[in-house]
Amino acid sequence: VANDISNTPPQMSGRILKAPEGNLPADLPDQARKARRNFMGRALAMGAGAAVAVNAGVASAATAPPGDGDPAILVLPEHSKGLGQPVAMEGGYGKPSKWEKNIQRRESPGLTRVPQSSVSFCPLQSLFGIITPSGLHFERHHQGWWDVDPSQHRLMVNGMVKAPRVFTMDDLMRLPSVSRIHFIECGANSAMEWSQPAVPSVQYTHGMLSCSEFTGVRLSTLLDLCGADTRAGRYVLAEGADGSSMTRTIAMENALDDVIVAWGMNGEMLRPQNGYPLRLVVPGVQGVSWVKYLRRIEVGDQPWFTKDEEIHYIDLMPDGRHRQFTSVQECKSVITTPSGAQTLLDKGFYNVTGLAWSGRGAIKRVDVSADGGRNWRSARLEGPVLNKALTRFNIDWVWDGSPAVLQSRAMDSTGYVQPKINQLRAVRGTKSIYHNNAIQSWRVAENGEVSNVQMY
């Protein structure tokens, strides 16, 4: 069957030429600086977002499968004949292999005026499972990152509480702790795809996304210790200690549910780029509410309507009005392999893999299409399938060499189904920046090149 999505892989698998790291074309920076300056400028004025069309890069030729007489098998390599490196090299902290040095989080040229207020994108196309290595976790800073002295860091809890308190890091880390796996996604993930395909690879279309195990104390525990009025106090304000004065309103319902005041990430202390020594973890909610360098929690009876809730992180509607406090990251998925800027070198079997997530619960099903959405088959969900965490999916695909369009469509535990881009635009228009959870399409050409397209 042509381009068959199946459950039984054939014996011989096709090969994929990986997307070259940093594969934005050489002439993109000048284009991007102009287009994205307009994009960001109009965004601040609640205008339309500009996009830059680019061509997917093509990497160098791949190595052919080994055959009879392969010297890699017949000639004994150096690592099989002598002593290797001693223990505790590289300063006592493990590093990736030198052969993987190109797998990096990367900036997008011209996205912002200064790198301290910018984004680095996670290389989703190069990752396995659901946990993002801490060193590849995407970054979003509003005024750069800091390496804060934990002995001098304090967390204040005040407002509508009986006993306002100031906690040191030692105070917090002596309290009962929990560890939970959750995804974090910037509300602007996929922002440049609202009007047309704008960037070539999944690193840039969906790379403001990561998933980690976070460790800390429940916010509800701190509120209880301080005697918070959780009836009249319907909201909490989270305030960060960096120069951007990031402040976000969080509903008390969320605060009492699964919000964590975290110091740990993936089994170690938070990295400075991720808010060391303390950050808020608000599962299912856009990343801006996961306030880094957390220094204050205030309980109040109404939202604070801060600058990052009235000017930024709002949804512009087609009639010119905007929606506020639309913080939940809706059900979404993306195929990471095969994906944009990769190249299929052979006909035959491929494992189509990707990620799905929802801010409202767990992923229940992911369907995959190889013909642009005309026919769908259910993918395998790889465990664990957790609430408000990434879920890895896989499905077998036989490519016959003809053009194909790969798509994934997720459904979460509430029954919500990920929409097509035209369905989303019918409600939201094309002038939005945030909360684009549309189905992503990857076109596979006859020559095997994979590119970013939109299907209506």
What does each of the following model-derived ranges do?
Residues R15, A51-A53, G57, L74, ...:
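Detector for intrinsically disordered, low-structure N-terminal pre-sequences
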Residues P25-L28, G41, G49, G401:
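Generic alpha-helix initiation/capping and coil-helix boundary signal
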Residues A64-Y456:
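Structured, non-membrane catalytic/scaffold regions adjacent to prosthetic-group chemistry
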Residues A32, N38-T63:
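N-terminal export signals
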Residues A19-G22, R37-G41, M46, N102, ...:
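General helical structural elements
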Residues D27-P29, R33, L44, V148, ...:
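A ubiquitous, low-specificity "background" feature that marks scattered single residues
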Residues V1-N38, S60-A62:
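N-terminal secretory signal peptides
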